[in-house]
């Protein structure tokens, strides 16, 4: 591979998830990390969700697909990779959004997601499920488009649920995750396509290279999402989450909170390694997103 590991870590592969005359959705796959970001495009306007630190990828995408980046969003405070959100928003003059729960105590310049029920992108309304969808981190947020596409951040993966223990409160956050699964997301239709922020296995891609799955299939294949007994669910999730944390996650979180600045070499070092942001479960292949 020309450029070796460095080039591989910076390689992003965009795939069109959906396109009609009103809406285009692109999934941008950072293969070395299993990180997924998204462009939601309508009428020449765009929203970028969960961008990686290589912001030129999104600038090139905007040029290629002829849209102006108006909104940049992080679904949560990432623990496994460095966000490009604030830098991208600053460079293009877009609004940067983050949950106020996630941004608490930081000096980030942001618009609180929890102030918005919807964000308009061209002719499309992006519904902000700042329900919020906690459980992974307390301010995790999901985004629903046309009741057909759920951009789930790290709350629901193709093969697992978000890890609730990265804040050291596994049991409390597992209870939040229970509420998310069985109340906040309960009424979403089975044919809603879940598009997560991570994946860990190439089997999670479909034949077009898109990582995503119908919510009904995830419910069907994911035993833990059918366990409506709160005590049992909480114990199972909290227990499954007691595993190794993402490498360097405290330093990465500090960078994403705007408390620490590092050079590119250190940033690359910090991001090397697998993602560990999902709960292991039974009923489908293991997830380590």
Language model features: what each stretch is:
Residues 15-70, 107-196, 280-288:
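Catalytic core of the metallo-beta-lactamase
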Residues 8, 79, 105-106, 204:
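Generic structural signal for helix capping and beta-alpha/helix-loop junctions
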Residues 1-7, 100:
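A short glycine-rich beta-strand->turn/loop micro-motif centered on a GG-aromatic cluster
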Residues 3-4, 53, 77, 199:
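Short beta->alpha linker loops
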Residues 98-105:
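Short, polar loop motifs at secondary-structure junctions
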């Amino acid at each position: 591979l020309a450029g070796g590991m460095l080039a591989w870590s910076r390689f992003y592969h965009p795939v069109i998830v959906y396109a009609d005359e009103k809406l285009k959705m692109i999934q941008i796959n950072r293969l070395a990390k299993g990180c997924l970001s998204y462009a939601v495009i309508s009428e020449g306007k765009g929203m970028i969700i969960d961008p990686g630190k290589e912001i030129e990828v999104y600038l090139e995408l905007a040029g290629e697909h002829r849209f102006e980046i108006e909104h940049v969003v992080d679904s949560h405070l990432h623990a496994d990779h460095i966000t490009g959100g604030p830098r991208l928003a600053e460079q293009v003059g877009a609004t940067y959004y983050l949950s106020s729960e996630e941004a608490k105590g930081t000096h980030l310049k942001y618009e609180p997601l929890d102030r918005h029920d919807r964000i308009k992108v061209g002719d499309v309304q992006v519904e902000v499920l700042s329900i919020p969808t906690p459980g992974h981190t307390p301010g995790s947020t999901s985004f629903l488009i046309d009741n057909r596409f759920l951009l789930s951040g790290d709350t629901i993966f193709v093969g697992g649920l978000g890890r609730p223990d990265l804040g050291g409160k596994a049991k409390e956050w597992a209870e939040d995750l229970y509420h998310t699964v069985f109340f906040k997301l309960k009424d979403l239709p089975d044919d809603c396509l879940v598009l997560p922020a991570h994946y860990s296995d190439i089997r999670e891609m479909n034949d077009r290279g898109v990582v995503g799955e119908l919510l009904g299939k995830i419910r069907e294949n994911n035993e833990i999402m059918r366990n409506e007994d709160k005590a049992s669910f909480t114990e199972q999730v909290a227990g499954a989450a007691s595993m190794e944390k993402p490498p360097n996650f405290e330093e990465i979180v500090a960078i994403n909170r705007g408390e620490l600045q590092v050079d590119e070499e250190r940033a690359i070092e910090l991001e090397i390694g697998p993602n560990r942001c999902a709960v292991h479960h039974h009923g489908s292949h293991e997830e380590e997103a």
